[in-house]
């Protein structure tokens, strides 16, 4: 294409080969294996020298196929290969005809053919999962049992101890709950008592303050009344003194044409100021 062609850029990350995690020697698994005697380059298992030394690869399953289905498909020669020997059913029919069991064999082969068709469309084949070689006995075809009497007795003792510890723990928990409940009840009672005492003290204090306020108010009212009465008496006495002084300050002779009128006013004022003259005017006798 040359320089005029479309340019495509390709970016590489910091770890394009994804080897940073495998080269990291500070991981927990790496350190733990080294504690058990493993060294880099060794394999795992009973014979580390001949075991698998590369990293375990995990592939994501994105289909509904069973285990080993993809491997089986890769082993097929073509798309028509179903993994069985071609012409085997025909050979079995010939053998059946020679042995005089043609009907039985043909019937069985028809049943097998129909069963394959049904299983191929709607059937499910279950594959038995393998177990560890150390736990499987091929002769008896059973799992090996390594339990013995000592282990059983030890397990029984452990169960007894665990049950005892459990019962002790339950008793302790019950006791702790009871103690906590008692403490809480005591605290609630004490708080209630303190509240009632505080309330009573507050009420007594309020009553006392009200009484003191009332007493102060009464004293103040009495004092105000006495002060008012004293002021009133002083004022009336002062007015009497002023009137008497004004009456005494009136000139004896008035050299005007209204001298007769002024004399009459003077006599009238003097008569009103004199209690004895007033008694004579109103004809009141002192007994």
From Swiss-Prot:
Query: Function, please?
Result: Involved in rRNA-processing at A0, A1 and A2 sites and negatively regulates telomerase.
Q: Where is this region: Disordered?
A: 143-254
The record's similarity note reads:
Belongs to the PINX1 family.
Q: Keywords, A to Z?
A: Nucleus, Ribosome biogenesis, rRNA processing
Keyword Flavoprotein on entry: no
The protein's location, in the record's own words, is: Nucleus, Nucleolus
Source species of the chain: Vanderwaltozyma polyspora (strain ATCC 22028 / DSM 70294 / BCRC 21397 / CBS 2163 / NBRC 10782 / NRRL Y-8283 / UCD 57-17)
Stated name of the protein: Protein PXR1
Please provide the Gene Ontology terms (biological process) for this protein.
Answer: rRNA processing
* Domain of life of the source: Eukaryota
InterPro entries, sorted: G_patch_dom, PINX1
* Start-end of Basic and acidic residues biased regions: 143-155, 191-200, 221-230
In alphabetical order, the GO MF annotations are: nucleic acid binding
Q: Which GO terms describe its cellular component?
A: nucleolus
Biased-composition ranges for Polar residues? 239-251
* Transmembrane helix among keywords: no
Q: Provide the gene name from the record.
A: PXR1
- Could you tell me where the Basic residues compositional bias lies? 163-190, 201-220
Show where the G-patch domain sits. Answer: 25-72
């Amino acid at each position: 294409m040359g320089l005029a062609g479309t340019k495509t850029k390709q970016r590489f990350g910091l770890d394009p080969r994804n080897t940073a995690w495998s080269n990291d020697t500070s991981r927990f698994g790496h350190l733990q294996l080294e504690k058990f005697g493993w060294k880099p380059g060794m394999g795992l298992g009973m014979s580390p020298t001949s075991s698998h030394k590369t990293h375990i690869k995990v592939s994501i399953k994105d289909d509904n196929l069973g285990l080993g289905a993809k491997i089986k498909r890769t082993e097929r020669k073509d798309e028509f290969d179903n993994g069985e020997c071609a012409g085997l059913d025909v050979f079995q029919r010939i053998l059946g005809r020679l042995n005089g069991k043609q009907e039985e064999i043909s019937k069985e082969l028809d049943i097998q053919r129909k069963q394959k068709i049904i299983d191929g469309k709607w059937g499910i084949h279950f594959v038995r999962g393998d177990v560890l070689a150390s736990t499987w006995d091929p002769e008896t075809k059973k799992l090996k049992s390594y339990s013995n009497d000592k282990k059983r007795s030890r397990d029984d003792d452990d169960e007894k101890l665990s049950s005892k510890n459990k019962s002790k723990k339950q008793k302790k928990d019950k006791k702790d709950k009871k103690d906590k409940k008692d403490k809480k009840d005591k605290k609630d009672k004490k708080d209630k008592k303190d509240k009632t005492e505080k309330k009573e003290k507050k009420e007594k204090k309020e009553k006392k303050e009200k009484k003191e306020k009332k007493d102060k108010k009464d004293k103040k009212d009495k004092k105000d009344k006495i002060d008012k009465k004293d002021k009133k008496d002083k004022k009336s006495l002062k007015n009497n003194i002023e009137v008497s002084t004004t009456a005494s300050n009136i000139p004896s002779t008035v050299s005007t044409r209204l001298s007769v009128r002024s004399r009459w006013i003077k006599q009238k004022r003097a008569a009103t100021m004199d209690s004895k003259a007033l008694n004579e005017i109103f004809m009141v006798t002192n007994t």
